[in-house]
Amino acid sequence: MFARFSILALVALLASGCSNTSPVLGGKNISYGDSKAVELVTNEFGSTDLQMIAESMTRSLAQSGILQGRPVVQVYDVKNKTSEYIDTREITTSIKTQLMKTGTARFASDNTDMQSQVDQLKLQNQSGLYKQSTVSKTGNMIAAKYRLEGSISSIVKRSSDYKDVFYKFSLQLIDVESGLAEWMDEKEIRKTTER
């Protein structure tokens, strides 16, 4: 009886040792929040704005029908015409990610990543380091049918009691061969703060 109780106690002790929680480091006033929750900390551009823009543009572009057949798209940097620092690359990355998840489009190396692609091809083909049967051949990259480009601008109005910020995000899909804008949309966001 004592041996059976000792074995059960040992198993319970071992099991409780395996269920250790990870240590938490840092301040006590920090907590995780819902990444999709509306963020109203300031009237500057924030995560909620980024998510609203990306979701709105992705939905509009996917529903337009222009991307039938999963064409290749090259994404250009969105021009930041605001007085704030806004990482516009995060907006286009979110749009690309959502379109990739839906299977609506394929993406060529964008204008900022193109040099990395060229460097990798040169390294494989000119360095002599790689087995020739595994080397990616030059001249086989797929050209984009469309380019996606846009801008974000803002108008800021202040009084002694209020600050009003109006953002306008514009995005367009251009047919590379014809130069025609095949799709265009914009998302407007207004944020007002009372002092």
Predicted regions and their residues:
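Bacterial N-terminal signal peptides that target proteins for export
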Residues: 1-7
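Alpha-helix termination/capping residues and helix-transition junctions
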Residues: 12-15, 67, 141
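Acidic/histidine-rich, surface-exposed loop or edge segments in extracytoplasmic proteins
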Residues: 31-45, 71-81
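N-terminal segment of the mature soluble domain
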Residues: 52-55, 60-130, 178-184
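A short, hydrophobic beta-strand-centered structural micro-motif
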Residues: 56-57, 73-77, 127-159
